[in-house]
């Protein structure tokens, strides 16, 4: 299950109300999800959104049909005029080496043009089923986003690997940058709620440099509080610092559900880039 389907995420989203849903067969829980509702101004209508959800058995077509029909009934009873969802499954998969070779040869402009290494037939069948049921998939933007969430994600399997094995799995340049950061005196630590302010200062600089609209400090404070109340492992803040620079020179937030972690937000300062703190913190 994605962290975007946890009750804590609903508490993070200002302007939305949220409700946790469960699908049952008798007394058995067979599916779960977080539904976000946003009211349309001046009318009693709502937009419903299930980010990276709901958590269903997407490989079973009959289960999917029953679950989504029940979801539509639930939503209509609450004045919902449109439902957005993001089934947490996959259709195509690329290995890192495949993408590296494409980048080196400049043979494709976007990832969708690259022939996949694997195709998930269950995922293809699900797409066909959803279209037949009247659901529509928005075309991915050039940036790789499909509506609100990234259409493509990169996953690294760390299970059973030592820290040394993980380090050796990095490419040569990445290993060199980490060693340089260590040699230059960059230190990395796990932050606390009080460190959100120095993270946010670094994050604002990143937003200005990279031309994106930043989140407010209160957004991160709300997210931290909600997720930490759910479980202390749900969110972590990693800070890189250096004696010659005030505050954070790089930082990232990491969210976690079970054994799966997500890189959520990242930040770095321009002045300390040569120290390679981003490599160290990641």
Q: What are these regions, as identified by a protein language model?
A:
Residues 44-146, 258-282:
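Acyl-donor binding region in acyl/amide transferases
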Residues 1-44, 87-92, 118, 135-274:
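A conserved beta-strand-loop-helix scaffold within acyl/acetyltransferase catalytic domains
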């Amino acid at each position: 299950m994605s962290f975007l389907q946890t009750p804590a995420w609903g508490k993070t989203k200002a302007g939305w109300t949220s409700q946790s849903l469960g699908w049952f067969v008798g007394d058995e829980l067979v599916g779960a999800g977080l539904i976000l509702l946003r009211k349309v101004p001046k009318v009693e209508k709502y937009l419903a959104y299930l980010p990276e959800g709901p958590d269903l058995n997407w490989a079973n077509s009959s289960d999917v049909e029953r679950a989504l029909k029940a979801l539509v009934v639930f939503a209509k009873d609450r004045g919902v005029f449109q439902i957005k969802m993001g089934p947490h499954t996959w259709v195509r998969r690329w290995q890192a080496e495949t993408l590296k070779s494409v980048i080196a040869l400049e043979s494709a402009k976007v990832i969708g043009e690259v022939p996949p290494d694997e195709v998930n037939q269950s995922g293809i069948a699900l797409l066909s089923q959803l279209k037949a049921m009247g659901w529509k998939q928005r075309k991915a933007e050039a940036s790789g986003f499909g509506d609100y969430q990234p259409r493509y994600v990169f996953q690294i399997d760390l299970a059973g690997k030592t820290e040394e094995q993980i380090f050796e799995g990095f490419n040569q340049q990445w290993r060199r940058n980490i060693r340089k950061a260590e040699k230059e005196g960059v230190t990395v630590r796990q932050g606390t709620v009080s460190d959100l302010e120095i993270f946010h200062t670094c994050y604002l600089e990143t937003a200005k440099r990279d031309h994106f609209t930043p989140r407010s400090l209160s957004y991160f404070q709300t997210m931290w509080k909600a997720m930490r109340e759910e479980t202390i492992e749900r969110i972590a803040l990693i800070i890189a610092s250096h004696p010659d620079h005030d505050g954070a020179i790089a930082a990232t937030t990491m969210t976690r559900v079970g054994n799966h972690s997500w890189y959520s937000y990242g930040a770095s300062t321009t002045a300390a880039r040569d120290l390679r703190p981003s490599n160290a913190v990641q």
